[in-house]
Amino acid sequence: PFFLGCGIYLPHLPWYLPGKYFDMHPLKKIRLPEHRTDDFDDIPEGGKRMASRAGGIIRESGKWREAVQGCLAAASFADACVGHVLDALKRSPYAENTIIVLWGDHGYDVGEKKFAKSALWEQTTRTPLIIHVPAALGGNPAAKTCTRPVSLLDLYPTLIDLCGLPPSQTSSQLDGRSIAALVRNPQVKWPYPAIITHSPHWHGPNHAVRSERFHYIH
């Protein structure tokens, strides 16, 4: 057995990447996200401080469309990098015996709530998460979408569970829980919310609770 942790830097800033990925997203076809000028009128000062100052600068400079293009181009480049890794796996003898987890550490605002991360709103806390378990390991060959809220803290106990490894002596001290049941059946009952904490070094600490229906920010 082997474990490969492959970190792809993009689409994190700076967006330095081959021009062909920008060409995949022509400026004239870029759709800007909805932005309300009064969006922050009903939130406390702490919430306003969370919002990146870059949002106003980018819009005022007239480069909002270019900023969205850069983010899309960087995501396309990262997608191509992931493709190279998956192609190599398919050519290997391990393709049908390897669990694949694709995830991002945070979301990103491109104008909805100003710009960047460093906040607890939906755009910045909702991350990509795809888990593939081969049929030989009990996985479901049909791709399915799960709407249950989960946390990145759940990945470690989930991999332990999916690999059939015994729980460690410290498993009871983990903050996350295995979501293997959701991987096998996305509709299984799941009463647990996702808990998000914003770094105390960035205008915090602040916390959020995300259930399937509600998103509460404190």
Residue ranges of predicted features:
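C-terminal cap/loop subdomain of S1 sulfatases and analogous C-terminal strand-loop tails that border
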Residues: 106-112, 141, 153-156, 161-218
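Active-site-proximal cap/lid insertion segments
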Residues: 1, 5-149, 162-171, 217-218
